[in-house]
């Protein structure tokens, strides 16, 4: 058989042309050390900051330190099976979590994996956990309220949709209680809630979930849990994951509320990671970028304009503005608000609700210090009726606290001072509220109205709360039309004021409290 050289070359050419070879180019390196969930890797030349890395056993990590001859990464999850010499591959992806309405009513971890035993989440979309906050042009000023249902907050420290309001205080003084009451009060108000639990005991998180289930609040709530037993990496990532889940609703013209409970634990977790990565420590051993840790998170809470929503949804949603309201929680040590993390977060947020252990122990709950607590933008969002009635309350309380300090030393007080002290005692009593019992707008309005117009002045202090409760029941049965008008208009007309005066006089005459 004679072979023609031209035939051979044609045959080889056709074979080469028909060859389909696809090369999957992936950079890989070698683990050189593993310490407390922190891995040093040699040989990853083109890895990105924040890129996902693939380890053996379907384990992933996050590249945080890019050094000249090595990469420092943090493992997401278990790391006991990773050892020196293991191969690490780059993925070319950044960390994403599932987002969407499928997450509502579920309890998930910091990576969006369900941990409530109710099966898979089946979310259709995922989104990056680190995102740039909307620019100034796309934002709108805060103008709609978030009703917490707590008398002292809604009257003196109002919160608006798109605001960042800090809840700050020592341990065990009611910070989580304020946050949970706010979630419970959103029933039927078209507000999706996200509760991010960071570094808490698993039993405490379970109690919160159970209470939300009992009150029917879990139907519109997502719980993101990174308990104390989880790695520092998960506690560091949980707030960003929760924020991304909230942004899904904000960017589609809906309203969402996110609670970070608490950011002190996140700062501790980040400090631990940074020290293990051998980053230089600064004040209180925190790394230099701990301010940026919280600012880039809290700046993502905003009220965005109709144009932003329309642009984001490619014209599917028109004429609707969206909002993400943030209530970060910070735990102080012995009331020290001048520590590093508290001062950082106070400067980032639009106001703070300051809770005091002394007030809590004195039975004044919620233990809000009216003098130090402030809402810088919430006043514009306060409902008309509450704004009209709450001005006097704050002044009364502030003057009462001032006078009460002097009255300890003064033996004989003039009539005006004595009256002011008596009024202050009754207002303080009126603002007390049991946990898990948030009030509607009309109930708050009626309480403030009775205090402002002197209907509590001749009552014993111990009778103030029974009087308030009895008054609400009386109005429900005898003046349902008045309640409906206040609730619908969120205002108090002259006729309604006259009707309320008459109702209060009748109720007081009856003595049914």
UniProtKB/Swiss-Prot annotation:
One of its GO terms (cellular component) is plasma membrane. It comes from the Bacteria. Keywords: ATP synthesis, ATP-binding, Cell inner membrane, Cell membrane, CF(1), Hydrogen ion transport, Ion transport, Membrane, Nucleotide-binding, Translocase, Transport. Its EC number is 7.1.2.2. It catalyses: ATP + H2O + 4 H(+)(in) = ADP + phosphate + 5 H(+)(out). GO terms for molecular function: ADP binding; ATP binding; proton-transporting ATP synthase activity, rotational mechanism. Disulfide bonds: none annotated. It holds the Pfam family ATP-synt_ab. CDD domains: ATP-synt_F1_alpha_C, ATP-synt_F1_alpha_N, F1-ATPase_alpha_CD. ATP binds at residues 169-176. It is found in: Cell inner membrane. The record marks 373 as: Required for activity. It is a peripheral membrane protein. It is an enzyme of class 7 (translocase). F-type ATPases have 2 components, CF(1) - the catalytic core - and CF(0) - the membrane proton channel. CF(1) has five subunits: alpha(3), beta(3), gamma(1), delta(1), epsilon(1). CF(0) has three main subunits: a(1), b(2) and c(9-12). The alpha and beta chains form an alternating ring which encloses part of the gamma chain. CF(1) is attached to CF(0) by a central stalk formed by the gamma and epsilon chains, while a peripheral stalk is formed by the delta and b chains. Produces ATP from ADP in the presence of a proton gradient across the membrane. The alpha chain is a regulatory subunit. Belongs to the ATPase alpha/beta chains family. This is ATP synthase subunit alpha 1.
